[in-house]
Design a protein with these regions (language model features):
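C-terminal scaffold of the Radical SAM
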Residues: 1-242
Length: 242
């Protein structure tokens, strides 16, 4: 990571107050890693928690427990980070409206600056779709449409009551702690994606790098050769997917 940051500073002028986020899996952070992140200028940590219920985490195939997340969260705070996001997912198999409310309340008590609350989307062709997709044997374990609707309403209600305002489809923040990265998508600002399969939006046109590793490495330094897809944008707001 240090080499990546060195390369970025060589090519780009990075603002002193830039928002620099690292995604972290609960249970994988260490004081040493966090110290190194701070030295590199990283100032925001985003945890992929998904749920505060260990049973739901197991159904999602997550390797961490809620207790491990709490340890990691405390570690990040002790390291001096003052901007933390927590990702959550509703409509998980066997999840109830009450268990979703409990997850929200547990997270609120931790007082993170930002919460991303997504509804589960089952992608076709995935192993998860084979288990829970339409017509699958475990489809019945998914919350009903009415339960999903209630979860959505409870999300906004509970978070709003606790000082988190909704500023984008699935994102809630304390005042002034909105994620600049998310706002960039929403406001259709230019962004540059670096790496295999990365996407960019430049002058209202989308680009996607090749997903072929050999092609990518052989054409390093020649962006016109690794950008395999491009199309004019419709000019509407982005939904956060690329």
């Amino acid at each position: 990571m240090e080499r990546i940051f060195e390369a970025l500073h060589e090519v780009f002028e990075i603002a002193e107050d830039a928002e620099i986020t690292v995604e972290a899996n609960p249970g994988t952070v260490t004081p040493e890693k966090l110290s190194a992140y701070r030295k590199l200028g990283i100032n925001r940590i985003s945890f992929g928690l998904q749920s505060a219920d260990n049973g739901e985490l197991k159904l999602l195939g997550r390797i961490h427990t809620y207790e491990q997340f709490l340890e990691s969260y405390e570690m990040v705070r002790k390291a001096g980070f003052t901007n933390i996001n927590i990702d959550l997912i509703s409509a998980i198999p066997k999840q109830t409206v009450r268990s979703w409310e409990e997850t929200l309340k547990r997270i609120i008590r931790l007082k993170p600056e930002h919460i991303s609350a997504y509804s589960l989307i089952i992608e076709e062709g995935t192993s998860f779709a084979k288990l829970y997709g339409e017509g699958s044997p475990l489809e019945r374990d998914l919350p009903s449409e009415e339960e999903e609707r209630l979860m959505y309403e409870k999300t906004e209600e509970i978070l709003d009551q606790n000082g988190y305002h909704r500023y984008e489809i699935s994102n809630y923040a304390k005042e002034g702690m909105e994620c600049r990265h998310n706002l960039g998508y929403w406001e259709r600002k230019n962004y540059l994606g670096l790496g295999l399969g990365a996407s960019s939006l430049l002058d209202n046109r989308r680009y996607s790098n090749t997903e072929n590793l050999r092609e990518y490495t052989e054409c390093a330094g020649q962006p016109e050769k690794i950008r395999k897809k491009h199309r004019a944008s419709d000019g509407g707001r982005a939904d956060g997917r690329i």
